[in-house]
Structure formats: C-alpha cells, structure tokens
Amino acid sequence: SGGAHGEEGSARMXKALTYF
C-alpha cells in the first residue's frame, strides 16, 4: 500500500508504515 486507505488488510498490518 502507498498510503491508500482501501487496503485495510495490508494497511492494518503496516498501519504505522502508512502513517509515517
């Protein structure tokens, strides 16, 4: 994911990565 809030699966695991 590159900051997209559509991949809840990937974003949930690397939420911190997407946040920063």
UniProtKB/Swiss-Prot annotation:
Top-rank lineage group of the source organism: Eukaryota
Disulphides: none
Compartment(s): Mitochondrion inner membrane
GO CC term, one of those recorded: mitochondrial inner membrane
Tissue distribution: Liver specific isoform.
GO molecular function: oxidoreductase activity
Pathway per the UniProt entry: Energy metabolism; oxidative phosphorylation
GO biological process: oxidative phosphorylation
Keywords: Membrane, Mitochondrion, Mitochondrion inner membrane, Oxidoreductase, Transmembrane, Transmembrane helix
Membrane topology: Single-pass membrane protein
Coiled coil: none
Biological function: Component of the cytochrome c oxidase, the last enzyme in the mitochondrial electron transport chain which drives oxidative phosphorylation. The respiratory chain contains 3 multisubunit complexes succinate dehydrogenase (complex II, CII), ubiquinol-cytochrome c oxidoreductase (cytochrome b-c1 complex, complex III, CIII) and cytochrome c oxidase (complex IV, CIV), that cooperate to transfer electrons derived from NADH and succinate to molecular oxygen, creating an electrochemical gradient over the inner membrane that drives transmembrane transport and the ATP synthase.
Subunit structure: Component of the cytochrome c oxidase (complex IV, CIV), a multisubunit enzyme composed of 14 subunits. The complex is composed of a catalytic core of 3 subunits MT-CO1, MT-CO2 and MT-CO3, encoded in the mitochondrial DNA, and 11 supernumerary subunits COX4I, COX5A, COX5B, COX6A, COX6B, COX6C, COX7A, COX7B, COX7C, COX8 and NDUFA4, which are encoded in the nuclear genome.
Family: Belongs to the cytochrome c oxidase subunit 6A family.
Name of the featured protein: Cytochrome c oxidase subunit 6A1, mitochondrial
Organism of this sequence: Ovis aries
